[in-house]
Amino acid sequence: VPVKDLDDALNDLVLWYKKHKFRFKPLILAIIIHNQFEHIHPYKDGNGRVGRLLLNFILIKNKYPPINIYLEDRFEYYKILQKYSRIHDLKSSIDFFVRQYKKTLEKVTTKHKEN
């Protein structure tokens, strides 16, 4: 998003969230907000970290555990974000994040059982 449009784009994102936060399941809502924030890309640095914080904030706020994007999956994560920015393909993003969510939960529960 061009610099001159950043304020409007971010305000629109917040308004969209407020209007739709009860319409979607928390994971889907978190993915949409994350992807759109990444598409807006308001900062020179740190957009990914802030986007993942938004993703997990929405999940935790709705009493869902947070999701982790594993280092070995970062390349696919970046490809998904690029695809979303080009053609707003939400299905690929949902598929990716659902797999990551399952992976996160499996790793956490396995680690918990080991201890």
Annotated model-derived regions:
Residues 1-115:
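FIC/Doc superfamily catalytic core
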